[in-house]
Amino acid sequence: MLKGAVTALITPFDDNGAIDEKAFCNFVEWQITQGINGVSPVGTTGESPTLSHEERKQVVELCVEQVAKRVPVVAGAGSNSTSEAVELAQHAEKAGADAILVVTPYYNKPNQKGLYTHFSSIAKAISIPVIIYNIPGRSVIDMAVETMRDLCQDFKNIIGVKDATSKIGRVSEQREKCGKDFIQLSGDDCIALGFNAHGGVGCISVSSNVAPKLCAELHAACFRGDYETALKLNDLLMPLNRAVFIEPSPAGIKYAAAKLGLCGSLVRSPIVPLAETTKKIIDAALHHAGLLKE
């Protein structure tokens, strides 16, 4: 079962702007040694909007090979074109991903029937599990709980949701409509603690790019009912959770990773490097979490 802290992996680039394969593989290995519960390549944090389809496939293949079945790999396979999403999903399955993460189609704004058609086409095309990624703030559409219910009832491999609505009440609604076994993962580190308390089972996390151990420990504490420890860890992480989103992501989390010597900070346009004032806030957040000692 997919559970705990799952890192929405950044994609390191070299000085020429190409994917830095060595840095990426080393980063994935570090994540595993730190105790992360799963990894999710080529999502928003992995800069999928500015990766070519071939680059997206390249990163998924690298990730699957490096992980070698030690933790689940949830490959990003979203597109606002159904046929493209099907192609990416089929590639992820062929590459050996354990599941796929599929964002609701962005920009073209389908209605609920269109959302059902999109996800059903993907589910029919593969046998591995599908996680719905519902993020109205970026896609401009919100999948209704009833549509989610219909999809998970009609397709056995649609097993859960990454919920980035920031509406904590949705957890209970989705639990009621989709069942207790429907996997609900927060898409927002800032509300992950409360999300778990309402019935969630983890988070597809941005902060865990630099704090995998702390994030995994937070969720483990939730699952054993130790909310006192979970709250202490949440307090350590909260400034970081906020700081890395002061400017458009993933510039903030890539800067934090570079500050810790994990990889370079280069982002692809139209995302741009951070202002110096933002860097100082992230530095302070890293200190607060005990991740930066200098």
Swiss-Prot record:
<dbReference type="GO" id="GO:0005829">
    <property type="term" value="C:cytosol"/>
</dbReference>
<dbReference type="InterPro" id="IPR013785">
    <property type="entry name" value="Aldolase_TIM"/>
</dbReference>
<feature type="site" description="Part of a proton relay during catalysis">
    <location>
        <position position="44"/>
    </location>
</feature>
<protein>
    <recommendedName>
        <fullName>4-hydroxy-tetrahydrodipicolinate synthase</fullName>
        <ecNumber>4.3.3.7</ecNumber>
    </recommendedName>
</protein>
<keyword id="KW-0704">Schiff base</keyword>
<feature type="binding site">
    <location>
        <position position="45"/>
    </location>
    <ligand>
        <name>pyruvate</name>
    </ligand>
</feature>
<feature type="site" description="Part of a proton relay during catalysis">
    <location>
        <position position="107"/>
    </location>
</feature>
<dbReference type="GO" id="GO:0008840">
    <property type="term" value="F:4-hydroxy-tetrahydrodipicolinate synthase activity"/>
</dbReference>
<keyword id="KW-0457">Lysine biosynthesis</keyword>
<comment type="function">
    <text>Catalyzes the condensation of (S)-aspartate-beta-semialdehyde [(S)-ASA] and pyruvate to 4-hydroxy-tetrahydrodipicolinate (HTPA).</text>
</comment>
<keyword id="KW-0963">Cytoplasm</keyword>
<keyword id="KW-0028">Amino-acid biosynthesis</keyword>
<dbReference type="InterPro" id="IPR020625">
    <property type="entry name" value="Schiff_base-form_aldolases_AS"/>
</dbReference>
<feature type="binding site">
    <location>
        <position position="204"/>
    </location>
    <ligand>
        <name>pyruvate</name>
    </ligand>
</feature>
<comment type="subunit">
    <text>Homotetramer; dimer of dimers.</text>
</comment>
<feature type="active site" description="Proton donor/acceptor">
    <location>
        <position position="133"/>
    </location>
</feature>
<comment type="pathway">
    <text>Amino-acid biosynthesis; L-lysine biosynthesis via DAP pathway; (S)-tetrahydrodipicolinate from L-aspartate: step 3/4.</text>
</comment>
<dbReference type="Pfam" id="PF00701">
    <property type="entry name" value="DHDPS"/>
</dbReference>
<dbReference type="InterPro" id="IPR005263">
    <property type="entry name" value="DapA"/>
</dbReference>
<dbReference type="GO" id="GO:0009089">
    <property type="term" value="P:lysine biosynthetic process via diaminopimelate"/>
</dbReference>
<dbReference type="GO" id="GO:0019877">
    <property type="term" value="P:diaminopimelate biosynthetic process"/>
</dbReference>
<dbReference type="InterPro" id="IPR002220">
    <property type="entry name" value="DapA-like"/>
</dbReference>
<keyword id="KW-0220">Diaminopimelate biosynthesis</keyword>
<keyword id="KW-0456">Lyase</keyword>
<feature type="active site" description="Schiff-base intermediate with substrate">
    <location>
        <position position="162"/>
    </location>
</feature>
<comment type="similarity">
    <text>Belongs to the DapA family.</text>
</comment>
